[in-house]
Amino acid sequence: MKKAFLVFLSVVLVTTVFLVKQQESVAQAKQLEYSGEEIFKGFVFAQGEVGKQLPEVFNKAMTDKLNTKQAKAFANQVVADIKKEDADFFDNLKKAVYSKDALKVDELLKKAGQIVEEKVEAAKEIAASKDDTSRVQAELVNTVDTANYFYYVSYVAAAGALILIILAIDITPIAISDNVDREMAIRTLVDELN
């Protein structure tokens, strides 16, 4: 009888320890919150840990195109431009995502989408007029707002790499015009991060 009681007590103790440890790891995982910038880069540019959590939104080929050195520089500059226009944007995005407010997330992403579209259009114009790298670099130096934005052009031997980045950005969730697909992508983001 004593032996059975000790076995029972051991099983209960091991089970309790296991459940407590499991709850602690779940709590730690929930405590991991991404910054607004990380959420934005992950959702719009498939970059970072957030981008890896959204395979329903980005296919592998698009993820690869959006994770090049040039694409990351482009994303960093877009983030800087958004901060310049709205210093609270990324804090508001983070709050909206973690409060599961898909409508607010959509509203914020539409606002950011306008900034991204302006930058993509500027990049398209530069890429289209690119006869040689040195001429484009000279144009960029003379363009006050975009001089730093397109600094990576000096590392690109041809316009091809820049065009690939632009084409990849054109089909990211921020550029989706179909409301159903856009809502599904936003819902996926909110669900994956909560």
From Swiss-Prot:
Localisation: Membrane
Top-level taxon: Bacteria
Signal peptide range: 1-29
Mode of membrane association: Single-pass membrane protein
Keyword entries, A-Z: Coiled coil, Membrane, Signal, Transmembrane, Transmembrane helix
Record-annotated membrane-spanning stretches: 149-171
Entry coiled-coil feature ranges: 104-131
GO cellular component, one term: membrane
Keyword Repeat: no
Membrane listed as a keyword: yes
Predominant location category: membrane
Name by which UniProt lists this protein: Uncharacterized protein YitM
Organism: Bacillus subtilis (strain 168)
